[in-house]
């Protein structure tokens, strides 16, 4: 049986973060899928997590996202296509939807 992780002392105990009411979360299983995405898709996915409502939806325009991420609009569209292909995002203009992660099939 796996032991619970031991508590660690923070490096800077005066700056321990707390979760704000508007907290956005990322599924820890994304760690194992980042390599398949590329930097632009990772940036877009992170942005969409920050922008999403409680159902995972957001209405940000590609041009606005591009400006916020310092990307070209075409890069945002290509990143979106990659996220769709990986099953991480659904899109119907102008709505983005973050999808729940499914465990990979063996």
Give the residues covered by each predicted segment.
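Short recognition helix of helix-turn-helix/winged-helix DNA-binding domains
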Residues: 1-56, 67
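Winged helix-turn-helix DNA-binding recognition segment
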Residues: 34, 51-104
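Short intrinsically disordered terminal tails
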Residues: 1, 105-106
């Amino acid at each position: 049986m796996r032991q619970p992780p031991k508590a660690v002392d923070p490096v800077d105990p005066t700056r321990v973060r707390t979760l704000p009411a508007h907290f956005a979360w990322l599924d820890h299983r994304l760690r194992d899928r980042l390599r398949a995405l590329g930097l632009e898709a990772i940036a877009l996915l992170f942005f969409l997590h920050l922008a999403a409502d409680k159902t995972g939806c957001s209405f940000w325009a590609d041009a606005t996202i591009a400006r916020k991420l310092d990307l070209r609009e075409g890069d945002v569209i290509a990143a979106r296509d990659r996220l769709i292909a990986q099953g991480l995002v659904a899109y119907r203009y102008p709505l983005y939807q973050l999808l729940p992660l499914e465990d990979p099939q063996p």
